[in-house]
A protein has these predicted regions:
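Signature of Gram-negative outer-membrane beta-barrel scaffolds
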Residues: 1-25
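Outer membrane beta-barrel strand-and-loop segments of large Gram-negative receptors
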Residues: 63, 82-143, 147-168
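Transmembrane beta-strands of outer-membrane beta-barrel pores
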Residues: 1-3, 31-37, 46-47, 78, ...
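Residues on the lipid-exposed face of transmembrane beta-strands in outer-membrane beta-barrel proteins
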Residues: 15-19, 70-76, 121-127, 165-173, ...
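Outer-membrane beta-barrel signature, preferentially recognizing the C-terminal barrel domain
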Residues: 6, 23, 35-84, 88-90, ...
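Conserved C-terminal beta-signal and adjacent last beta-strands/turns
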Residues: 160-206
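Repeated loop/turn-to-beta-strand initiation elements of outer-membrane beta-barrel proteins
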Residues: 24-27, 78-82, 131-135, 174-182, ...
Length: 206
């Protein structure tokens, strides 16, 4: 028996507009869109046990999601960047847990949400310290929101304000042969949301 899971027709606009007030002040508007499809294993109706009380289950009804992004960017002195951004993702999917009603098991399955919405502001500041240290600092603040009205007899509308600090560094250890450089990068995020989850601090140094 065949059935149609989805049948839609959608525009995916992509555009970049730039206005140069003078070489010291540049304003740019970026609009982009895309479509993301689930993997084969995400839609395969197969049950994979994690332990005696948890399983991973495929979702044959999982739909691809569309993403629409917009950025308004101001570039000062062809060096410093200030931006405002917004990302809207209808039908966004993520792996979420729910309680099986027929047996004592947690089921982890990819589910389509109503939407994911993020918007915020950021600033990018590059700088140098002599010939030894070249760095770029990114600071941003945003509001994250994910919503699903029908989730196994439940619903959620999870939202959170978050901040992010990111720093990319290149240290020149030797300019003569051999030319040695060291890259040291790191970020810190105050938190995030994913479906019913309220995630704590995230960080990484590499």
């Amino acid at each position: 028996m065949k059935s149609t899971l989805w049948n839609d027709w959608t525009l995916f606009p992509n555009a970049t507009l730039s206005y140069t007030v003078n070489p010291m002040h540049i304003i740019q508007l970026d609009i982009s869109s895309d479509k993301t499809y689930p993997s084969y294993w995400d839609v395969t109706p197969q049950e994979s046990p994690i332990n005696s009380y948890s399983v991973i289950l495929g979702n044959p009804s999982l739909k691809p999601y569309r993403s629409y992004s917009g950025q308004l960017i101001y570039i000062l002195k062809q060096k410093y960047t200030i931006l405002a951004f917004c990302d809207y993702v209808p039908d966004y999917f993520a792996q979420l847990p729910y309680q099986n009603t027929s047996e004592l098991k947690n089921v982890f399955r990819y589910e389509n949400m109503d939407y994911q919405l993020q918007f915020g502001v950021g600033v990018i500041v590059p700088f140098r310290v002599g010939e030894f240290w070249n760095s770029q600092v990114t600071l941003s603040g945003q509001r994250m929101q994910e919503k699903l009205d029908h989730f196994h007899d439940l619903s959620f509308h999870n939202e959170k304000y978050t901040g992010q600090f990111k720093m990319d560094n290149t240290f020149t250890l030797s300019k003569s042969r051999p030319n040695l450089k060291l890259d040291l990068n790191g970020y810190f995020v105050t938190g995030a949301v994913q479906g019913i989850y309220d995630l704590g601090h995230l960080y990484d140094v590499s």
